[in-house]
């Protein structure tokens, strides 16, 4: 096996920043359990990184994504009813998207 060092990699981006992460577990009215980590960062134009910790699926989401048909179903592999309930929760926590120049 070839031993590689950091100089062998061509980094396109490499940065460190302070983030805020909210960990929340809840059960929807339809009895679907969600264990989420919702990370706020200076990246992603104000959108948040939402991770389903039970299944290891994540997406960068903002309020506009919640209005797009099929986004939550596709990313988190859930049905339409579960997606509607998740969207109702995420609407409360995602906040507005902030675009910069």
Question: Model-flagged regions — what are they?
Answer:
Residues 1-35:
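Negatively charged, low-complexity tracts enriched in Asp/Glu with abundant Ser/Thr
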Residues 1-2, 36-45, 86-90, 100:
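Short charge-dense sequence patches
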Residues 17-19, 31, 52-53, 84, ...:
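Amphipathic alpha-helical interaction segments
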Residues 26-31, 41-43, 66:
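Generic structural motif
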Residues 38-64:
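A short, structured beta-strand/loop element
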Residues 63-101:
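Mixed-charge, Lys/Arg-enriched low-complexity segments
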